[in-house]
């Protein structure tokens, strides 16, 4: 898993920063809601977020390359990085409301921390999808470039970080992130509880069916 790899890299003295990226057209398009075990599984969210929490405990600066979609939990993964490099074709969305659901992966903490509470509310309550240019404008992405230059720009940033003293970088990052892991740890418990509650509602089932069939959901508030 990603968390296992990050744990291993934390032990590597020669590793001073990490580039997080995916192969293919998307960074991470979120959960596959067509899988029945997602809906019926017990404690699936608690187990998932325990693993996610490990990512936030990494001691090395993480640079995420966001191409294509970063949707739902995929957005949460992108937000776990220290920096995000993207292109105009990328798509970002906290689409939980459109599913009759609740955000997870610590997004309750990371999204407002990065773009501010009002912008976070706007994205979460509307479930709107924004492109890379819009993400850059609101601070969701730190660098925007052409799709074919994403890795080059990520390596440039990593090399810039790597020229600084590793002990100093670790100390600076620890101070800036002071209390973040604890805050996210508390948030994911609340997120998981809300997700477990909402997954048994008619609205959630309607939201999933509408998403799969690519139609507008008809929510009834039950």
What are these regions (language model features)?
Residues 3, 7-14, 21-57, 70, ...:
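Glycine- (often His-adjacent) and acidic-residue-rich active-site loop
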Residues 3, 85-90, 132, 141-189, ...:
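C-terminal long alpha-helix characteristic of the crotonase
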Residues 51, 55-57, 65, 71-125, ...:
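CoA-thioester-processing core
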Residues 128-134:
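Acidic, divalent-metal-coordinating active-site segment for phosphoryl/phosphodiester hydrolysis
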Residues 206-211, 219:
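Anionic, Ser/Thr-rich low-complexity intrinsically disordered regions
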């Amino acid at each position: 898993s990603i968390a296992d790899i990050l744990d291993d890299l934390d032990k590597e003295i020669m590793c001073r920063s990490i580039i997080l990226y995916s192969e293919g057209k998307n960074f991470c398009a979120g959960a596959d809601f067509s899988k029945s075990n997602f809906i019926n599984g017990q404690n699936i969210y608690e187990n998932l977020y325990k693993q996610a929490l490990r990512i936030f405990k990494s001691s090395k600066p993480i640079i995420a390359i966001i191409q294509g979609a970063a949707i739902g939990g995929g957005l949460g993964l992108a937000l776990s990085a220290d920096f995000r490099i993207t292109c105009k074709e990328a798509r970002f969305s906290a689409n939980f409301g459109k599913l009759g659901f609740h955000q997870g992966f610590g997004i309750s903490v990371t999204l407002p921390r990065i773009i501010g509470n009002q912008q976070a509310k706007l994205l979460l309550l509307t479930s709107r999808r924004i492109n890379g240019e819009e993400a850059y404008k609101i601070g969701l992405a730190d660098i925007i470039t052409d799709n074919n230059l994403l890795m080059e720009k990520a390596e440039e940033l990593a090399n810039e970080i790597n020229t600084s003293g590793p002990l100093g970088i670790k100390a600076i990052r620890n101070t800036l992130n002071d209390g973040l892991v604890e805050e996210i740890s508390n948030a994911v418990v609340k997120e998981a509880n809300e997700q477990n509650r909402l997954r048994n509602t008619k609205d959630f089932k309607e939201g999933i069916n509408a998403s799969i069939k690519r139609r507008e959901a008809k929510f009834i508030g039950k």
